[in-house]
Amino acid sequence: MKILVVDDFSTMRRIVKNCLQEIGYTEIQEADDGNTALPMLQSGSFDFLITDWNMPGMPGLDLLKAVRADAKLAKMPVLMLTAEAKREQIIEAAQAGVSGYVIKPFTAATLKEKIDKILATKAAA
C-alpha cells in the first residue's frame, strides 16, 4: 500500500513515517502541504492519505475537500492528524468526508488501529 504523509513540520512527517514503518508499511512518500500533495496524489498511484489539519498554503481540510471533489481520488481513504480535539473540527472533517481522525500525540499502535479500521470499512463498502 502506497501512503502519502502530508505535514508542514518535517519532524512530524518523520514520526508518522517511523510509526508506519514500525507497523509494516514501507511505501511512504511525503509532502509539506496540500499544494504540494494534491498534484502528487493526482499523478501518483497512492492508496492512502495521512494529512495534518493545520498547514500553511492549503490546510488539511482543504486538501480533504479537493480529494473528495476529484473523481479519480474521491474514494481514497484519508486519515486526518491534528493537535486539536475540538468537536466543531471533528464534525467539519466528518462532513467533508474524512475516513478517520487521530489526535496528536499518538502511538504506532493507535495509528495501526485507525488505519486497520479505515481499511476494513473500505473493504466492506
Go through each PLM region and give its residues.
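Active-site residues of response regulator receiver
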Residues: 52, 82
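Alpha4 helix (beta4-alpha4-beta5 surface) of REC/receiver domains from two-component response regulators
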Residues: 17-18, 62, 85-100
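Receiver (REC) domain active-site loop signature in two-component systems and cognate sites
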Residues: 55
